[in-house]
């Protein structure tokens, strides 16, 4: 049985615009709508999740702040960060012989990042108590990927943000994901110049995600 997955490369687009498109897609889809992945980068923006607390926004400066409907706390998006939004019909999994829970979807996102980074020689890992993906460098734990999902009508939207080759300075203006003092890192910290490129990393990320969840008809 073919289990299709449509992958869309959106380039660099405004956060609010893509957010509205995700909501519209989720509201309008039906049981026959193929699942989709949207690969995108955003201009600089801070986003507050539904659990976001204002005290974690320390000094936004000129960077806009958006109150989002995803789960989680505050994070930063900017050019050089690969966003992968996953628009998945979770409840349809049983029809394909798969029982996908929200926790399994989160795990699939985390493991797709872990496997992708392993291909670059980076040893990364998830944490059960703090969703996302982390790297231990010289005894210090740093976060390289943040996660946030919303489930509506049994379908997911939002997804992950993997730091590839970006300006990490704005993360110092917040408590990332609600953790004071949490240091962020990116793929460019661990590889040679030129290897940390969103266009090179994103197909690997999608391939691992599709394999983990059993998609066998991925269309870019």
From Swiss-Prot:
Annotated BPL/LPL catalytic domain residues: 31-217
Biological pathway: Protein modification; protein lipoylation via endogenous pathway; protein N(6)-(lipoyl)lysine from octanoyl-[acyl-carrier-protein]: step 1/2
Residue numbers binding substrate: 70-77, 146-148, 159-161
E.C. number: 2.3.1.181
A Gene Ontology biological process term: protein modification process
GO molecular function: lipoyl(octanoyl) transferase activity
Entry's Gene Ontology cellular component terms: cytoplasm
CDD domains: LipB (cd16444)
SUPFAM superfamilies with a match to the protein in the record: Class II aaRS and biotin synthetases (SSF55681)
Keywords carried by this UniProt record: Acyltransferase, Cytoplasm, Transferase
Function statement: Catalyzes the transfer of endogenously produced octanoic acid from octanoyl-acyl-carrier-protein onto the lipoyl domains of lipoate-dependent enzymes. Lipoyl-ACP can also act as a substrate although octanoyl-ACP is likely to be the physiological substrate.
Name by which UniProt lists this protein: Octanoyltransferase
Provenance organism: Actinobacillus succinogenes (strain ATCC 55618 / DSM 22257 / CCUG 43843 / 130Z)
